[in-house]
């Protein structure tokens, strides 16, 4: 994997300490959210909700508990599609290719810049109506 073209995973100060958060401000999409460490538990979900540094949703509170209980020094959340939505009906019907490409770049960056353990979290999602 060539890392010279990948974005730099950079920690910043947010409520509660140092976080990885891409983009660095609340947007209608999110690529990366997690705690800083060298050996993270990396979880891949379907799409992000409203969570942000210092304000985790129930899913990310569970990821954080699981990482802590299993002696990981950190955790990072990714999603198959980066668009934020609390309701599947609000998601893009046709994926935005630019969002998908940037999402993959951030996943590659984390894999190249940390020593992760991957965890794929699957749930049943109905087709939006």
Name every feature range the model reports, one short phrase each:
Residues 29-35, 103-110:
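Short, charged beta->alpha transition segments
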Residues 84-105:
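Charged, often glycine-rich, active-site loop that binds/positions anionic groups
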Residues 58-61, 101-103:
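Charged helix-capping and loop-helix junction motifs
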Residues 60-68:
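Short catalytic helix/loop segments, enriched in acidic residues and glycine
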């Amino acid at each position: 994997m060539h890392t010279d073209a990948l974005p730099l995973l950079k920690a910043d100060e947010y409520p509660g300490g140092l976080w990885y958060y891409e983009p660095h401000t609340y947007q209608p999409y999110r690529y990366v959210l997690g705690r800083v460490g060298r050996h993270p538990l990396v979880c891949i979900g379907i799409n992000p909700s409203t969570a942000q540094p210092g304000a985790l949703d129930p899913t990310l509170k569970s990821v954080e508990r699981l990482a802590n209980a299993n002696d990981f020094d950190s955790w990072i959340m990714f999603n198959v599609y980066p668009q934020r939505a609390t309701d599947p009906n609000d998601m893009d019907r046709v994926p935005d290719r630019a969002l998908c490409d940037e999402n993959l770049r951030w996943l590659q960056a984390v894999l190249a810049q940390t020593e992760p353990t991957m965890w794929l979290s699957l749930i049943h999602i109905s087709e939006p109506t």
